[in-house]
């Protein structure tokens, strides 16, 4: 396990970030983020990397050189627009927070309405939230055909939550993400498209 990743997780924890936000920032699962924040100090003291089997392994994706540049993000957004070219839809819904910049660029490129979905992992309240919500300061998507956009799909939980919510008010037709770690091709009848997909190759010696 990269020590740089552990340092980043601990730094975000000390800044007050909850596990869900740490997972979003580092493109890892919430389970891995929680593990790092609880065990990070011990892992840094260890001289050997812990052995992980294929069921426990998580993949750390770092694409800061792309997402830190609006110019480079525009190129990624244009590829996603090409994927969406044959789909008829009215609006773009970006999943907060990583999907919002991409959804903004796509909606501008394709001249579509824009909205955001805030998943429950980003809602910090004393009351337990069962689902996220659609931002009220953006275009209305009620009764419209929409596309869901995110940057990295790890477990697929945020996308599943978005689809379930959106089906109650609109018609989600497709999900498009930059990187997929889940291996999921369809969620509740909604196809999932990706630019890149990661996977674990289990080699038994």
From Swiss-Prot:
Protein name as catalogued: Transcriptional regulator GfcR
InterPro entries per record: GfcR-like, PRibTrfase_dom, PRTase-like
Keyword field: DNA-binding, Transcription, Transcription regulation
Gene Ontology molecular function: DNA binding; orotate phosphoribosyltransferase activity
BP GO annotations: pyrimidine nucleobase biosynthetic process; regulation of gene expression; UMP biosynthetic process
Domain of life: Archaea
Record comment regarding domains: Contains an N-terminal DNA-binding winged helix-turn-helix domain and a C-terminal regulatory domain (or effector binding domain) resembling phosphoribosyltransferase (PRT) domain.
Disulfide-linked positions: none
Pfam families per record: Pribosyltran
UniProt similarity note: Belongs to the purine/pyrimidine phosphoribosyltransferase family. GfcR subfamily.
Transmembrane segments: none
């Amino acid at each position: 396990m990269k020590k740089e990743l552990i340092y980043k997780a601990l730094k975000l924890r000390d800044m007050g970030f909850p596990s869900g936000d740490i997972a979003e920032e580092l493109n890892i699962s919430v389970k891995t983020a929680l593990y790092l924040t609880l065990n990070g100090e011990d892992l840094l003291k260890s001289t050997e990397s812990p052995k992980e089997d294929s069921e426990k392994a998580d993949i750390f994706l770092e694409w800061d050189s792309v997402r830190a540049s609006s110019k480079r993000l525009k190129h990624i957004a244009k590829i996603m627009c090409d994927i969406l070219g044959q789909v008829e839809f009215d609006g773009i819904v970006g999943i907060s927070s990583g999907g919002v910049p991409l959804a903004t660029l796509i909606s501008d490129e394709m001249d579509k309405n824009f909205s955001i979905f805030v998943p429950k992992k980003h809602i910090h309240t004393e009351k337990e939230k069962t689902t996220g919500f659609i931002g009220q300061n953006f275009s209305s998507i009620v009764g419209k055909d929409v596309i869901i956009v995110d940057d990295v799909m790890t477990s697929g939980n945020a996308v599943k939550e978005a689809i379930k919510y959106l089906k109650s008010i609109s018609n989600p037709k497709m999900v498009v993400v930059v990187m997929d770690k889940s291996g999921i091709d369809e969620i509740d009848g909604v196809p999932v498209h990706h630019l890149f997909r990661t996977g674990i190759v289990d080699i038994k010696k």
